[in-house]
């Protein structure tokens, strides 16, 4: 099972995927400097690290990225897991946002949110509280699990796919995701993420596939 074809990569050596939009298009909510560091340096470093870790590991070179994540988690290969998972998580995040996104979804996503959280407003409040409650670095996810949507948070490089949960949306709450533009105001960043960034079409595609 592939959890997300856009976030997965099928073959070694792995690459830094291009952003699915121009980095300038997120002004004023994200500056180009944020993308230069977050995508060009942080994300890229995970790619380079993983390729170096696998250069003499032919058995792992045959796996796709999701396969490496699952294998390394099961076999306690922490360094391999951290870098592989961070590649996947970041790519999933880039698709979770888009210029002029956010606001209220429609269609199947809105119906599912209303059913599982009571209202879109209650969903937003719970999402924000989970994001603010993540101590230190991590991620806040919306997953489809046991036939319903859930909001969960993971620390550091952890990812829900190792627990057989289907991610449909993620917000990066590592400080490098927002510190250049928002400093220590994670709350402001989360508000902007919800109101101006979420790519609801990507969320819908993940929900129905």
UniProtKB/Swiss-Prot annotation:
Binds 1 Mn(2+) or Fe(3+) ion per subunit. The keyword Transferase does not apply. It is an enzyme of class 1 (oxidoreductase). InterPro entries: Mn/Fe_SOD, Mn/Fe_SOD_BS, Mn/Fe_SOD_C, Mn/Fe_SOD_N, Mn/Fe_SOD_N_sf, SOD_C_sf. Its cofactor is Mn(2+); Fe(3+). GO terms for molecular function: metal ion binding; superoxide dismutase activity. Gene3D superfamilies: Fe,Mn superoxide dismutase (SOD) domain, Iron/manganese superoxide dismutase, C-terminal domain. This is Superoxide dismutase [Mn/Fe]. It comes from Rickettsia typhi (strain ATCC VR-144 / Wilmington).
């Amino acid at each position: 099972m592939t959890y997300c074809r856009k976030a997965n990569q099928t073959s070694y050596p792995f690459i830094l995927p291009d952003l699915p939009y121009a980095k300038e298009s997120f002004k004023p909510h994200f500056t180009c400097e944020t993308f230069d560091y977050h995508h060009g340096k942080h994300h890229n470093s995970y790619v380079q690290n993983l390729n170096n870790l696998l250069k003499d590991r032919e058995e792992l070179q045959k796996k796709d990225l999701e396969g490496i994540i699952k294998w390394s988690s099961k076999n306690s290969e922490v360094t391999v897991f951290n870098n592989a998972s961070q590649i996947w998580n970041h790519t999933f995040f880039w698709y979770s946002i888009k210029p002029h996104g956010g606001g209220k979804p429609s269609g199947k996503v809105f119906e599912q949110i209303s059913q599982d959280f009571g209202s879109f407003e209650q969903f937003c409040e719970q999402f924000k509280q989970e994001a603010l409650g993540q101590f230190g670095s991590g991620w806040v996810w919306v997953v489809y699990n046991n036939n319903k949507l859930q909001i969960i948070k993971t620390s550091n490089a952890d990812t829900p796919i190792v627990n057989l949960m289907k991610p449909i949306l993620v917000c990066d709450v590592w400080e490098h995701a927002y510190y250049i533009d928002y400093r220590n105001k994670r709350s402001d960043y989360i508000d902007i993420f919800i109101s101006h960034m979420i790519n609801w079409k990507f969320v819908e595609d993940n929900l129905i596939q």
